[in-house]
């Protein structure tokens, strides 16, 4: 079951709802998840999107996604799917944040450079 909220400006509500619903139906059909997608300008942060777990982190089911609001439809779709894949990784327990550290399959990768992070490689 999916509980989806979205907010922001300069984005297609229909596209957002369609992508998130498709993803959850395909990859997380037996999980209850709550996802809020906030569309905003992220150029200052030099990112197109990011996702995180809303605490508590134990059995995460509530997520926030921030996504840049000025992208082409194809770039928007690719970015949102990338961030949703991180949601999947957290729900399945592959990616965990504990005690200020980030674990991938039980191994601490807190000091791993972005381009070498296994969860980012998998999400691409």
Q: What function would you assign to each model-found segment?
A:
Residues 3-7, 67-71, 107-114:
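Short coil/turn segments at secondary-structure junctions
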Residues 59-62, 89-93:
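Glycine-rich loops and low-complexity Gly/Arg-rich segments
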Residues 2-59, 63, 73:
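Auxiliary, metal-adjacent structural segments of Zn-dependent hydrolase domains
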Residues 62-80:
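Short pre-active-site segment immediately N-terminal to the catalytic Zn-binding motif
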Residues 74, 90-121:
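Post-HEXXH active-site segment of zinc metalloproteases
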